[in-house]
Amino acid sequence: MDSYEYNELLKKLQTKVENIGSIVKPDDIKARLKEIEAIEQDPDFWQDIARAGALNKEKTKISNMLAKFSDANQAVSDAKELFELANSENDEETINSLFEDAKNLDEKIVNLEISMLLSGEDDGKNAIVSIHPGAGGTESNDWASMLYRMYLRFCEREGFKVETLDFQEGEEAGLKDVSFIVKGENAYGYFKAENGIHRLVRTSPFDSAGRRHTSFSSVMVSPEVDDDIEIEIEEKDLKIDTYRASGAGGQHVNKTESAIRITHIPTGIVVQCQNDRSQHKNRATAMKMLKSRLYELELMKQQEASNSVEKSEIGWGHQIRSYVLFPYQQVKDNRSGEAYSQTDAILDGDIKKMIEGVLIAQKAEA
């Protein structure tokens, strides 16, 4: 890096920070924090626990955003000031030190961008994720299992907790269906980028002739619906089936028909849960899954109506990413346009940067 490149980087980062500032509105956040602090002084503040909890959650969220913005803004300002001073004094040591730190400064602004992109109403919620293999039998079942493992490894890396709600093993390998809930900060904000069709191209380990196969799996992601969100579901619109828990449902597999499958007739949405020995608990969880799916469906309808996203980007049937393992190795995301050669690392859960690339690309198009 030379002085011209560094100066251009500072200009780019300064513009980014200013653009983020126009969205974040730090002065408005400071004013809102003062409002909340005044409300907290009320002796009756904790009488309404739900309201107090919501305000505390809001306070933490906007305080964190303000701190990140202030830190990034100050970092760019300090770097600019120090660079100008070092140039005026021909201080090569300081200039080289700034060059070496350029990557860290750039990453700080990217992290601020991501924080801003994950500040949506539902981004902070837990995520309910379902993976369904496409046509292709064992090959597709195995691909669904590979995706499931990729997400589990990603959750381990990021400190998300995972609870499997339903797991149905494939007949020869892989899985026929899996649903799980991801719990943690911005779980839905990250996982919403995985909503869509995932395509795999590889030499099949199940083909004795070693031919190339293409497999598909769909990933569906919904925000876990809070109890305070009302979604009306009429009993007449539901078809409820019970069945025996099977496969890798875990230690709770038993001989009673405790597993629940609920079909929402008007939309055709199907949810399943076999996580618990209790049919009653499985039904409650399945209903929560259904509410989350219906909530997500309504959000997508609103987005489509407002034209905030292209129609092709909305549905769960949209192909979002290709994973090519043969004849070359590359993962390409159709939304960001980015291609990655570290296929092994990605399938081992190293997908954070790829997801963040999608979030940034989608914001740029909005």
UniProtKB/Swiss-Prot annotation:
Q: Which residues carry this modification: N5-methylglutamine?
A: Q251
> What is the predominant subcellular site recorded for this chain?
cytoplasm
Q: Which SUPFAM superfamilies match?
A: Release factor (SSF75620)
Subcellular localization, per the record? Cytoplasm
Q: Name one GO cellular component term.
A: cytoplasm
Q: Which UniProt keywords apply?
A: Cytoplasm, Methylation, Protein biosynthesis
Give the molecular function GO annotations: translation release factor activity, codon specific
Question: What processing steps or modifications follow its translation?
Answer: Methylated by PrmC. Methylation increases the termination efficiency of RF2.
Family annotation (Pfam families): PCRF, RF-1
Q: Hey, which family's this protein in?
A: Belongs to the prokaryotic/mitochondrial release factor family.
Function, please? Answer: Peptide chain release factor 2 directs the termination of translation in response to the peptide chain termination codons UGA and UAA.
Cited PANTHER family? CLASS I PEPTIDE CHAIN RELEASE FACTOR, PEPTIDE CHAIN RELEASE FACTOR 2
Record's protein name: Peptide chain release factor 2
Specify the taxonomic lineage.
Bacteria, Pseudomonadati, Campylobacterota, Epsilonproteobacteria, Campylobacterales
